[in-house]
């Protein structure tokens, strides 16, 4: 018995080590990048400019918002607690700058840009407006909404209209343009509109952004912990604004917003001006087999690799006298798909350069109008 006891090892150090390893794993901090390509001349930054904390009606401490965003692969966020709506003031003092100060300090350690903002929370019209790149949110706490907006403008803020079709202010869910919004645009006090808020898409707002040259925004308006609203492990994600900026600095983001260089990424939809969506698609999709052979009425397959996190749904042109193509092709995110090329006749021969016209149905350049693009490859036709 004593010999066995001398050769055995105590169990507790091993158990303690296991416990430490499990604890370390449970608290592992890791970032998942959002794979959407840069476009010529600009970086594609992933941003959320509408976020709440416990300092208004949110349920999360501000530093958690920075941590969530960094882990989800975002480059910048804005903390935009309500100015007028303070339901937690019995537990927390009203301190309009404090949530940004806490989140900003945490974001600095993660190299995440955290922008100071506020939500000017008024009845419709004009509704709720976000002002970001503020220098002092306290100055917006005034009775008159026009005075609040004028103060935001004086501070150099970028101002946008939140959730224009929100049923809390528009019970039928339809976005409506009021004379107050015309007034704001005319005085350079409205620079963008949320085309997407949470899981809601507002086609009227999409059209207004194009008509009135306003920036398109897509934001979460998150109140709860992120993983309660979005099933991240199943591939779900918050809506984000893509900002095409010269670099990742706050100044570059602000310049890009005022220049309207933005797009909307929500679910599997990408919404924006063609000048931005076209290069994103072209830089996402790579033709792996740019030259195929088709013998007679046989088939060949062009391999298309999608390097982005965006799935694409293509509707190719049906073909011509020599070749035919499928009516629909799905390009899953991060995977390679096969485009079938089928011959129509037994006796065709020669080499052709194909510029296959396609619509990308989940990339919208206008409401209900998909992006039109081309896929280029070569086909050698051989007689059977």
Segment roles from a protein language model:
Residues 2-15:
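Bacterial N-terminal signal peptides that target proteins for export
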Residues 6, 52-54, 178:
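Compositionally biased, intrinsically disordered low-complexity segments enriched
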Residues 11-13, 160, 176:
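Residues in intrinsically disordered, low-complexity segments of regulatory proteins
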Residues 13-23:
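Bacterial N-terminal signal peptides
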Residues 15, 27-48, 66, 124-134, ...:
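Charged catalytic cores and adjacent phosphate/nucleic-acid-binding surfaces used
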Residues 30-158, 162, 170-171, 188, ...:
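A metal-dependent hydrolase metal-coordination microenvironment
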